[in-house]
Amino acid sequence: MARIAGVDIPRNKKIEIAITYIYGIGRSNGMEILRKANVNPERRVRDLTEEEVGRIREIVDREYRVEGDLRREVQLNIKRLMDIGCYRGLRHRRGMPVRGQRTRTNARTRRGRRGQAIGIKKKATKK
């Protein structure tokens, strides 16, 4: 397995797909990285030379914010919104949808299982 930005890249996948296993790199950024590193996107990771992996690793480290740094930045952005008390920060704090979605129904993913109705239970029969 090739290791880029602290992530083990799967050996059997094409490099254009495998590079997206790095948090912060999607399909378009991945293709851009491969173009800059002069690597054919159709090649499998196991077929890459150590030099090609090194070029990809260098480009990712130099030009992109990925993995831990990106996660930390996102968390700090959310914390900043909560600290200044803006509407988006309040929604984050309450665990509600942030981007204007309806909440009378739906929003289950964000809100979790709150106050679900409990079904009627049958009384146990005597034997």
UniProtKB/Swiss-Prot annotation:
Listed GO CC annotations: cytosol; small ribosomal subunit
Membrane-spanning ranges: none
SUPFAM superfamilies reported in the protein's UniProt record: S13-like H2TH domain
Pfam families reported in the protein's UniProt record: Ribosomal_S13
GO terms classed as biological process: translation
Region annotation (Disordered) ranges: 93-127
GO MF terms, alphabetically ordered: rRNA binding; structural constituent of ribosome; tRNA binding
Gene3D superfamilies: 1.10.8.50, 30s ribosomal protein s13, domain 2
UniProt xrefs under InterPro entries: Rbsml_uS13_C, Ribosomal_uS13, Ribosomal_uS13-like_H2TH, Ribosomal_uS13_bac-type, Ribosomal_uS13_CS
Keywords: Ribonucleoprotein, Ribosomal protein, RNA-binding, rRNA-binding, tRNA-binding
Function recorded in the entry: Located at the top of the head of the 30S subunit, it contacts several helices of the 16S rRNA. In the 70S ribosome it contacts the 23S rRNA (bridge B1a) and protein L5 of the 50S subunit (bridge B1b), connecting the 2 subunits; these bridges are implicated in subunit movement. Contacts the tRNAs in the A and P-sites.
Subunit field text: Part of the 30S ribosomal subunit. Forms a loose heterodimer with protein S19. Forms two bridges to the 50S subunit in the 70S ribosome.
Protein family: Belongs to the universal ribosomal protein uS13 family.
Name by which UniProt lists this protein: Small ribosomal subunit protein uS13
Gene of this entry: rpsM
